[in-house]
């Protein structure tokens, strides 16, 4: 995994512009009440987060000497997601919030940050102290989606 601390204001502005385009496209895929609700969702982490991290998977890493990547190359990306989850949990223990911005064009993010071609974009994280604390997910709280029970995801065989 590769973490890029995006601190340069010009690069942040480029990421923000990328988000604006992708967000407008996403809004265009909604209609009626769903579009109104989408437009009200809190998507301002790119403007307020003091720390912004772009996270990539190095698809040509020499680390591990390719062990397991011939049969399951996707585990490189899964390892990155595991690192993100570990960072997220550690941050939360300190009262720090993490937001995953997924409304971005991955190719444009990689280009804006001038990373090697072998780096696959996985996540853009906004990190900072939250303005307010909640125990329920924001998308549930705002009516975007109902909470789904664990039984929907766990199968017994």
Residue ranges with predicted function:
Residues 1-2, 123:
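Extracytoplasmic/periplasmic beta-strand context in beta-sandwich domains
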Residues 2-80:
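Glycine/small-residue-rich phosphate/adenosyl-binding loop
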Residues 24-30, 114-137:
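A glycine-rich helix N-cap at a beta->alpha junction
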Residues 44-47, 115-117, 147:
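Solvent-exposed alpha-helices and their adjacent loops that cap or buttress functional pockets
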Residues 50-52, 98, 120-124:
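Structural motif
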Residues 53, 59-112:
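Small-aliphatic-rich amphipathic alpha-helix that forms the alpha element of a beta-alpha
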Residues 123-157:
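C-terminal helix-cap and adjacent tail motif
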């Amino acid at each position: 995994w590769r973490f890029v601390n995006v601190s340069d204001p010009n690069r942040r502005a480029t990421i923000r512009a990328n988000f604006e385009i992708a967000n407008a496209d996403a809004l265009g895929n909604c209609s009626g009440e769903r579009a109104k609700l989408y437009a009200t969702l809190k998507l301002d982490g790119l403007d307020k987060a003091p720390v912004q991290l772009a996270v990539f998977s190095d698809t040509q890493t020499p680390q591990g000497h390719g062990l397991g990547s011939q049969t399951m190359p996707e585990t490189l990306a899964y390892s990155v997601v595991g690192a993100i989850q570990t960072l997220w949990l550690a941050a939360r223990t300190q009262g720090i919030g993490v937001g995953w911005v997924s409304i971005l064009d991955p190719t444009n993010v990689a280009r804006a940050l001038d990373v090697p071609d072998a780096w696959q974009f996985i996540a853009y994280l906004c990190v900072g102290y939250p303005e307010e604390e909640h125990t329920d997910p924001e998308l549930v709280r705002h009516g975007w989606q109902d909470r789904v029970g664990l039984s929907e995801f766990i199968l017994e065989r």
